Amino acid sequence: LNAGLQYTGSKTPRRSTQGFELTFAVNHLSHFYLIQNLLPSINKSNNSKIIITSSEVHNPMSSGGRVGAKASLGDLLGLVYGAGFEMIDGNQFNADKAYKDSKLCNILFAKELSKRLRKKNLSIPVIAWAPGLVISRDSQGFFRYSRKYNLLGQILFAFFARDLLRIATSNEKAGMLLSDLVCSSKYNKYDFSYYSNKIISPGKFIFEKSTISKEAESEHLSNKLWELSKSLIENQIR
């Protein structure tokens, strides 16, 4: 599962057909809904894995997570209010934070899903991973939706990050990491795990098992996110 919708620079939230803030709807809630429908088939197949693409920006202590607004879901008050919320924590819309929050949701969802599968004695690895900063050379990919808000800024950022500082990776290399996660037996641990593609020097990365943020470790938060996501779907989608 992979969705990285972001509208950096936008001052107002966009909404799904059901009225959900679009970053949350696409990056988290669609994953939750899809997995509920796929689980019966996944349970019947051999050597299944569930892989969810997150980001290091879910962690306020990471290099990307420290820049701008910090990821934090509070007590999920926005979700308690129903479909009309602007931010998960109940505050006013911030496009940068909305993206980071959605990536934190990815981690919490993966962790809670793994716990619930184990309680059912289902041996299915659940992996969350962060590919790192991926910037393509075409008009797609990174910031493709937010270019209209700051085209020059996005072009300059891509040049410095990808070509000058070399802290970004390519679509092809990120795809190879995902392929390895899917195909390699070394990622068959029947538990939740998180892997990150971390930069160690310009142009050089190491893909390794990593720690999640302190907030992502919260069992209370992961369970509450699950139950509220389920409620939103039952009330607004089905």
Regions found by a protein language model. Give the residues of each.
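A catalytic-pocket lid/entrance helix-loop region that shapes and gates access to the active site
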Residues: 146-149, 214, 225-226
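Alpha-helical membrane-targeting segments
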Residues: 91, 133, 137-171, 205
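Charged catalytic carboxylate motif
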Residues: 105-108, 173, 224
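Short acidic, glycine/proline-rich loop/turn micro-motifs
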Residues: 13, 206-213
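Alpha-helical interaction elements in eukaryotic regulators
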Residues: 16, 221-225
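Rossmann-fold NAD(P)H-dependent dehydrogenase/reductase core
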Residues: 1-146, 236-238
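C-terminal helical subdomain
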Residues: 102, 157-209, 219-220
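C-terminal functional modules
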Residues: 228-229, 233
